[in-house]
């Protein structure tokens, strides 16, 4: 049986893969749930997503993990999930990574709560290296931050706020790149936003560390000025930074320092986002607009070819998590 599809003038691409989404399920489903999240993913061209573990309860046990995976099977896409690195996101005691892997965890992350204890991170990386799994890190040292979600710079000065400096990200990226080099662990630097962090990932890769990096569409399209125009809708962790940072992110995409585009799709309710800037939660949606932003901001200006964009949105994320998707094959 042979079926021929006339695709002249069209682009044939694999289903997109997003390794960083928040579907808020269980426990926070007034914001989003697995089914509405999967629908948004499908509308944006994504056929595989990896959910983060910061739900209520946290995905630090097999029961909660199984719930997410079973609900995911009821959708029209492949819904995978990371489990937490630390129990209760407390950064003190490691989860049963081996057991959670056997139960179906795609990898591990405490995304949303940066891990502050260096020796604990080293221990987790050693275990991840033994198990040949991926650890993903939210890199923001809270000791440098007074108001998260807004870059510490000209816009925060205008608003009279001490925000989140790039140093908060840079310091943890440097730490974790070096721990990854020492342990041989495979790690993902999540939602990279600082130009200096891009430079450190570039150096770590040259040194032989198994460091991957992801960037969001909002970080390669917008700057901190968006906060003045859009208020809480432009508040996210890490924050939008300067035009220099944005250009450095694009350079990182061009030279392969940044391997993946991931949305960090993080919906909140309308009521939450209507709160004052310093009180509203951080987060922005992205699944439905990611591909369009990539084409408009990266392909059309000539930064990436369409094939390179597809690699960063399908092949590379699938390769990181050893998924059987993200490529076009016969069969």
Residue ranges and their predicted role:
Residues 70-85:
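A glycine-rich helix N-cap at a beta->alpha junction
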Residues 9, 20, 41, 45, ...:
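Divalent metal-coordination and catalytic microenvironments
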Residues 68-74, 97-102:
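Acidic (Asp/Glu)-rich catalytic clusters
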Residues 18-21, 46-51, 78-80, 152-161:
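Gly-rich Lys/Arg/Thr-decorated short loops/hinges at beta-loop-alpha junctions or inter-strand turns
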Residues 45-50, 76-80, 104-107, 179-186, ...:
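Short, surface-exposed connector motifs at secondary-structure boundaries
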Residues 8-72:
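Metal-associated gating/positioning segment near the N- to mid-region
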Residues 158-186, 233, 254, 259-261, ...:
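His/Asp/Glu-enriched, well-ordered alpha-helical/loop segment
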Residues 94-261:
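Histidine/acidic residue-rich metal-binding segments in metalloenzymes
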């Amino acid at each position: 049986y042979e079926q021929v599809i006339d695709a002249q003038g069209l682009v044939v691409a694999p289903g997109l893969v997003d390794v960083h989404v928040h579907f808020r399920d269980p426990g926070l489903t007034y914001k989003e749930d697995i089914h509405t999240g999967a629908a948004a993913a499908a509308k944006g061209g994504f056929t595989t997503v990896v959910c983060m573990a910061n739900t209520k309860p946290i995905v630090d046990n097999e029961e909660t993990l199984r719930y997410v995976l079973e609900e995911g099977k009821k959708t029209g896409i492949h819904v995978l999930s990371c489990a937490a690195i630390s129990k209760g996101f407390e950064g003190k005691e490691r989860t049963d990574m081996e057991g959670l892997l056997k139960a179906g965890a795609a990898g591990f992350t405490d995304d949303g709560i940066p891990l502050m204890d260096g020796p604990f991170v080293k221990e987790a990386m050693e275990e991840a290296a033994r198990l040949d799994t991926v650890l993903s890190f939210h890199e923001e040292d809270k000791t440098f931050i007074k108001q998260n979600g807004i870059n510490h710079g000209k816009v925060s000065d205008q608003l009279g706020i001490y925000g989140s400096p790039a140093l908060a990200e840079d310091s943890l990226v440097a730490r974790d790149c070096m721990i990854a080099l020492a342990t041989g662990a495979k790690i993902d630097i999540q939602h990279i936003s600082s130009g200096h962090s891009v430079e450190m990932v570039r150096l770590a890769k040259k040194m032989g560390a198994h460091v991957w990096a992801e960037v969001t569409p909002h970080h390669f399209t917008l700057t901190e000025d968006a906060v003045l125009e859009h208020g809480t809708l432009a508040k996210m962790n890490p924050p939008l930074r300067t035009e220099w940072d944005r250009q450095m992110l694009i350079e990182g995409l061009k030279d392969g320092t940044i391997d993946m585009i991931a949305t960090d799709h993080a919906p909140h309710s309308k009521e939450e986002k209507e709160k004052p800037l310093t009180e509203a939660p951080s987060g922005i949606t992205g699944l439905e607009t990611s591909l369009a932003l990539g084409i408009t901001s990266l392909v059309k200006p000539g930064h990436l070819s369409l094939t390179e964009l597809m690699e960063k949105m399908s092949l590379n994320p699938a390769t990181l998590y050893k998924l059987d998707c993200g490529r076009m094959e016969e069969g």
